[in-house]
């Protein structure tokens, strides 16, 4: 087959009067660019379909004037216990596990996290009693440990660690730098999409007010790594709602659909000391 054969076939069968162009993607990001497109002076007709291929109406991503990023986060804070209750919490300890099946082998990953209100945090991942990964942040410095090798946090990682080590980082958001992107849909649930930083986006349920998803981008050795975390369920612990099951999609574990982590033990106000974060 030559180039001329392909060209001749295209000119014979690819006719503009019976051509359809299918565009898939995030509607809130592509609809504005598609509307108003013209061909030979005539505006193109746009039709919308849901994820099952059924024709539907044009999605509406607009947000009413009385809704802001600040009001959405304030509603979330109230939904999980209220500012006063959250500020009383001294520490959070969480233990969980995930069952994995990779290349025909089944094993269990165990997750542990300890944070306090002094900007100190510890998280570990173990498999079969062996430490797979460890992350520590102690107020102003920290490190990641992988396969026994300790790697100090970079300046950008320290900035993220300071935010992530907070028990409830939403209490300290600077709304002058946070953008309300609009409405969206996550797992068939209508949500508000908020851009917290250039590298972090959060999604809050319009119905319940709860945060149901985070998408965070980090750069490792020049590569952009995107981690998606979806909250499947919350559990009330001493008057505070804490995520009790999450699904995480990360390049570190290239598993279709990600991994589901169930937190079997969640404790508030456990005693901590500086030695816990060495």
Features from the language model and the residues they span:
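Extracytoplasmic
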Residues: 6, 14-19, 29, 89-91, ...
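Solvent-exposed coil/turn segments that connect beta secondary-structure elements
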Residues: 24-28, 39, 51-52, 99, ...
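Gly/Pro-enriched, hydrophobic low-complexity segments
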Residues: 126-131, 189-277
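N-terminal mature ectodomain segment of secretory-pathway/periplasmic proteins
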Residues: 71-149, 177-185
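Flexible, processing/modification-adjacent segments and terminal tails
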Residues: 65-67, 71, 78, 136-200, ...
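Envelope-exposed proteins and targeting segments
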Residues: 17-20, 90, 140, 176, ...
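Buried hydrophobic packing residues in well-ordered domains
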Residues: 6-9, 21, 76, 94, ...
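Mature, solvent-exposed C-terminal subdomains and processed small-chain segments of exported/organellar
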Residues: 1-89
